[in-house]
Curated annotation (Swiss-Prot):
It comes from Sulfurihydrogenibium sp. (strain YO3AOP1). HAMAP family: Asp_tRNA_synth_type1. It is an enzyme of class 6 (ligase). L-aspartate binds at residues 183, 229, 456, 503. Gene3D superfamilies: Bira Bifunctional Protein, Domain 2 (3.30.930.10), GAD-like domain (3.30.1360.30), Nucleic acid-binding proteins (2.40.50.140). The gene is aspS. Keywords: Aminoacyl-tRNA synthetase, ATP-binding, Cytoplasm, Ligase, Nucleotide-binding, Protein biosynthesis. This is Aspartate--tRNA(Asp/Asn) ligase. Aspartyl-tRNA synthetase with relaxed tRNA specificity since it is able to aspartylate not only its cognate tRNA(Asp) but also tRNA(Asn). Reaction proceeds in two steps: L-aspartate is first activated by ATP to form Asp-AMP and then transferred to the acceptor end of tRNA(Asp/Asn). Residues 207-210 are annotated as: Aspartate. The record marks 38, 91 as: Important for tRNA non-discrimination.
Amino acid sequence: MIDQLREFKRDYYCGDLNESNIGDEVRLLGWVDTVRDHGGVIFINLRDREGIVQVVFDPSKIGEELYNKAKKLKSEYVIGVRGRVYRRPAGTENPKMKTGNIEVAGEELLILNTSKALPFPIEDNIKVSEEVRLKYRYLDLRRPSMQRNIILRHEVYQAVREFLAGNGFIEVETPMLTKSTPEGARDFLVPSRLEKGKFYALPQSPQLFKQILMVAGLERYFQIAKCFRDEDLRADRQPEFTQIDLEMSFVTEDDVMTLAESLIQYVYKKVLGIDIKIPFRRMSYEEAINKYGTDKPDLRYGLELIDITDLAKEVEFKVFNDVAKSGGLVKGINIKGGSKFSRKEIDELTEYAKKFGAKGMAWVKLENGEATSPILKFFTEEQKQKLFSLMDAKDGDLLIFIADKKDITHKVLGFLRKHIAEKMNLIDNSKLEFLWVVDFPLFEWDEEENRLVAIHHPFTSPKDEDIDRLDEALNSPEIALSFKSKAYDMVLNGEEIGGGSIRIHTPYIQEKVFQLLNISEEEAKEKFGFLIEALSYGAPPHGGLAFGLDRILALMTGSESIRDVIAFPKTQKGICPLTGAPDYVSEKQLKEVGIKVEVDEE
């Protein structure tokens, strides 16, 4: 069969043929998509990665041997066809196909391979479990939508490299076998055979190495980097994922953000033909949380959070009053047109709120000139009017409220806001709302560990005005919690697609931050000693950013999960149904690396 290909060379991809090819003799290679027999005339749709074209075997125009060969064809047979391109007869055109005005009259047929019966059809919108799709990923990837996703991924790679190389960046690969460090998700560990008892870690990001490349004087680095995190998975997470990673010397936050905006603008124009306006809007972390309940707000719709805590201190409704007077937060959302929600739908919203930590949800419905609610009996007439004024309430609105600790109130209303927007079809999926979230806190308090933790990572620089207060903060976590960082996150339609910061570039400040994070001098030296040492040899000011490539691709393609833009993803349990990974290994292999495995019977 392979010998046949020596004389049979493809002229065109199926999807590239058009009316300019009418009259041409062409050679095509691909897979049989469908076979139809209409009155003895055999029609096949031949498919390759660029599309589909109709091939006709008409017994009145070809020999018996060729016709009988064509009759044997079934779905997913691999074939070569030589024939001439014709315009389809009037009335038989297919406007749904890119090649729907033409067909190829088959004159030669090579059957290069046959196929078993398929576990699912090779078409879009199939109703089959993701588990089955991933088990037969080689078939799933034949589907046109999946091929488009993988090709688009390649085009994004190319555009990223073009832009960054054109802006003075050098592509450098950093190690995949590195050292386990604290302050992050769990590491994937790799045992060393030569240094028994010791382990490499797969990198969660190239963070330390890219900073060291700045110390090395390369000034502008980038890498399309594989990263690994052993964490619980969800729709937008994978144990291994890809970042567009970059770092720059002698830069400010504005420099990095401007470069990142231009990169996104270039990629969207080059790959999708979409014009993105820059600069992007900027919003402080505090404003994002206060208005939208999240540090990655979706700005395609309103439903902003409204603070009624001061009013809640005055009313006799105990739930509001107790929370407001104990330092909590009472906030609401005005759902315009929400009065049409039934009591059952309001109860469903309450149950949804409870999933995220709410104890309940108060509501007020304004309908036909009346306000109805179980809580209004606790409000005076003046307090009711003040509430309606604060909430900008009009007839036809539904007001919902959460009263709890500050972080819970924001979190719950943030999720409710998104849920309501989806339920009421308020989201314009054609819009691209880019946003920078800036002025993040440098630290947050971990209640479980009873210590400060870094919001981003421990190498993020504090704002200049906070650097002089580092010593003071060592004895006062409250002071440290007021520090702002030189960090920035890029958000698109409510998804964080990238983030970075200006880094700490002096050993003194880095050591102070480690102290605030309760990382001892010994631990810092053991885990990060090579970085602190490097910073002491004239490290330039530097900063950078990493984009989540898989997430950007999911947004570009409208995919519900990043698994649809990765060729060979894992399931939500971290399993590869195609290969069966992870799997047990032999006792011999374990012995070579000095490991004994104890498996929990449960």
